[in-house]
UniProtKB/Swiss-Prot annotation:
InterPro entries: Major_coat_LA-virus, Major_coat_LA-virus_sf. It comes from the Viruses. The lineage of its organism: Viruses, Riboviria, Orthornavirae, Duplornaviricota, Chrymotiviricetes. GO terms for biological process: viral translational frameshifting. Belongs to the totivirus major capsid protein family. It is found in: Virion. Capsid protein self-assembles to form an icosahedral capsid with a T=2 symmetry, about 40 nm in diameter, and consisting of 60 capsid proteins asymmetric dimers. The capsid encapsulates the genomic dsRNA and the polymerase and remains intact following cell entry to protect the dsRNA from degradation and to prevent unfavorable antiviral responses in the host cell during all the replication cycle of the virus. Nascent transcripts are transcribed within the structural confines of the virion and are extruded into the cytoplasm. This is Major capsid protein. SUPFAM superfamilies: L-A virus major coat protein (SSF82856). The keyword rRNA processing does not apply. Residues 688-697 have a biased composition (Acidic residues). Keywords: Capsid protein, RNA-binding, Virion. GO terms for cellular component: viral capsid.
């Protein structure tokens, strides 16, 4: 799965092995050259933006809550000779294996009955998820949260942290949690039968005092004071954990470092052959490590209510029955160890994987939100139809990976149809009006938003009513993939506009697509435009924040024929204007082309530095071989992508099932290339050395 997540990063982005994060927000994006041209009956004007900047912002705060759920067992890691030819556990073979164990001398049928019950519950995902959380809480523990800080601000209205997280307190990431420790006990070799509801794990060698503390905290309740996304609330996994350790257990030290956590994870995965459990936990943390900072005030509605993180019940009998684990392990994928190996080598890559995953998910959710509920493929059915009727729960990482498949046009496979992880579609499915609390910054704010209060004063708190969820993120890493008019994410585009007689100086748009292109390219050139809706009389401006530099027409409230009037005499050049539009004459043709992409990443308005060796790609043959083996396995779950299609009014969309033979969509990625990473031992090379400053507007 690390190969898939690597492939979501664009080719121009070359991550390093070390990332220094000390702020709760990171702005990521790209600089690119944009060549623009304006032509009318009077002549042609050209302009270039050699260093245009487009970005999204993510934060280490989020509204999540963990809940314990029953999930399917993950059987990878058990000895292969207890499975039948269909990949199912055979209790007769289990009994044979137990009867040969030197640890079990009597009452084998009874042991087999206990083993049968426990093996069909086996799942270590939540334990690894919590251990991964502890790793990054320790590593980036100095990140601070301030409840009175601004979460979102666009000049008309702002949203404060305390409005989104009313029960929060100021804290650093590490100080936001005071974790108790569950009991970590040595498994008594003379124990007659498994203790009810007490998992038992295997361990190599002696459990150090620091590992004892890590395991105890990972099994305990997380009850945070501040809304850091990875420190979200979660219930206790177990009151007690048995460890079958040949050299014993040291008492808890009460302290440890993030490197100690990495060591403990590596030992635990290896001893229990739990590589697939770790992979599921890695995907869960990729879902929750960071959250989007919304692009609009209305998009904050995605995050008003807590997102549920499904955490599978911790169940493991490996410590009770080591004879069922320590021989030639069963596994569904030959690549089952890759995610752990990749994480051990490049733990900071999880940040980039998280950014890439949530961007793909929220960009595609912006498409799903535009689909009619009466369509066959809609917000309720897209996951079920993607897996072609396989029995899965419509929650967790399966939903996110379906969105990733739809965003990239790529088929994705999983070894098990697990339902663990964050379910981020709840806001979309609730189908009711969502109220977003904001602070007024401009008394004209009610003209732009559906606010409860129509007369406001600066500094007043009011509420924006949101019925249609707009996109929370724009395409950045996925810019140019499966492009739509909705997101205006083309590498090049053009529009032709017929002007009324010159003494009139007005343009009328009856086509939403043409209107959006015109407004977007005008904003890209550096011109402010205001249009009038000829039906309702309301105003629409081509406002866009500086980090996107493009107008995104997301208004879906309008029903019926689009009709907008633009008075060209009111067009105003911005402080930074690259193509000035003066006295337009006759037919206008506007076009642009983007080239020369360079990665950019900022924190606190300063470049965010990456150091160390490069994470590089190698030949794709290994992945393709693995993919062919994967397709031949009946047990695996395949998520098939749907193709987004826009209707005449592009604000409304629909999905169609495409050919799965491959995508020829032009993009910044090689669509079939899944990257496998290795360290290139080159000298330290901060990203800032080959980065240009963003446009200032």
């Amino acid at each position: 799965m690390s190969s898939l997540l690597n492939s979501l990063l664009p080719e121009y982005f070359k991550p390093k092995t070390n990332l220094n994060i000390n702020s709760s927000r990171v702005q990521y994006g790209f600089n690119a050259r944009i060549d623009m041209q304006y032509e009318d009956d009077s002549g042609t004007r050209k302009g270039s933006r050699p260093n245009a900047f487009m970005s999204n912002t993510v934060a280490f705060i989020g509204n999540y809550e963990g809940i314990i759920v029953d999930d399917i067992p993950i059987l990878d890691g058990l000895r292969a000779d207890i499975f039948d030819t269909h990949g199912d556990l055979d209790m007769g073979l289990v009994e044979d294996a137990l009867s040969k164990s030197t640890m079990i001398r009597r009452n084998v049928p009874t042991y087999t009955a206990y083993a049968s019950e426990l093996l069909y519950k086996r799942n270590l995902t939540s334990l690894f998820y919590n251990m991964l959380r502890l790793y990054y809480i320790k590593k980036w523990g100095s990140i601070k949260y301030e409840k009175d800080a601004i979460f979102y601000d666009n000049g008309h209205a702002c949203l404060l942290n305390r409005q989104l997280f009313p029960k929060s307190r100021d804290a650093s990431l590490e100080s936001s949690l005071s974790l108790p420790e569950a009991e970590i006990a040595m498994l008594d070799p003379g124990l007659e039968f498994p203790e009810e509801d007490v998992p038992a794990i295997l361990w190599h060698g002696r459990v150090s005092s620091r590992a004892t503390c890590i395991l105890g905290q990972a099994c305990s309740e997380f009850a945070p004071l501040a809304p850091f996304s990875i420190a979200h609330y979660s219930p206790q996994l177990t009151r007690k954990l048995f460890v079958n350790a040949p050299a014993g257990i040291e008492p808890s030290s009460g302290r440890y470092t993030h490197e100690d956590v990495k060591d403990a994870i590596t030992i635990l995965v290896s001893a229990n052959q739990a590589y697939t459990d770790f992979e599921a936990a890695y995907l869960m943390l990729a879902q929750t490590l960071v959250s989007p900072v919304p692009r609009t005030a209305e998009a904050s509605a995605w995050f008003i209510n807590a997102g549920m993180v499904n955490m599978p019940t911790l169940s493991c009998a490996n410590g009770y029955y080591p004879a069922l684990t320590n021989v030639n392990p069963y596994h569904r994928l030959d690549t089952w160890k890759d995610t752990l190996n990749h994480w051990v080598a490049y733990p900071d890559m999880l940040f980039y994987h998280s950014v890439a995953m949530i961007e793909s998910c929220y960009v595609e959710l912006g498409n799903v939100a535009r689909v009619s509920d009466s369509d066959a493929i809609n917000k309720y059915t897209f996951t079920e139809l993607s897996v072609q009727g396989r029995p899965v729960m419509n929650r967790g990482i399966i939903v996110d990976l379906t969105l990733v498949a739809m965003r990239t046009g790529r088929e994705i496979s999983l070894p098990y149809p697990v339902s663990c992880g964050l379910t981020r579609t709840d806001a979309l499915l609730q189908g009711t009006e969502i109220h977003v609390p904001v602070v007024v910054k401009d008394i004209d704010m009610p003209q732009y938003y559906n606010a409860i209060d129509k007369d406001v004063i600066e500094g007043q708190e009011t509420v924006i009513k949101v019925k249609q969820l707009p996109p929370a993120m724009y395409p950045i890493y996925t810019y140019g993939i499966n492009t739509t008019e909705f997101y205006s994410d083309h590498f090049e585009d053009q529009v032709q506009v017929e002007m009324a007689p010159i003494d009139n100086g007005k343009a009328v748009f009856n086509d939403a697509r043409k209107f959006s292109k015109f407004m977007s390219i005008m904003r890209m050139m550096g011109n402010d435009v205001t249009a009038t809706d000829l039906v309702t009389g309301r105003k629409v401006s081509n406002w866009a924040d500086n980090s996107s530099g493009r107008f995104l027409y997301t208004d879906v409230k309008y029903e019926g024929q689009t009709a907008f009037l633009v008075d060209m005499d009111t067009v105003k050049a911005r402080d930074h204007c690259w193509v000035s539009i003066v006295d337009p004459n006759g037919t206008m043709n506007l076009s642009y082309k983007m080239t020369n992409f360079r990665a950019a990443m900022f924190s606190r308005n300063k470049p965010l530095y990456m150091t160390g060796g490069s994470v590089r790609t190698i030949a794709t043959g290994n992945y393709r071989d693995a993919a062919e083996r994967l397709r031949a396995m009946d047990e695996t779950l395949r998520l098939k992508p749907f193709k987004i299609t826009e209707k005449l009014d592009f604000r409304v969309a629909a999905y169609a099932i495409p050919s799965l033979s491959g995508s020829n969509m032009p993009s910044l990625h090689h669509q079939e290339q899944l990257q496998i990473s290795e360290v290139d031992a080159e000298p330290i090379n901060p990203i800032g050395e080959d980065e240009l400053p963003p446009d200032i507007e």
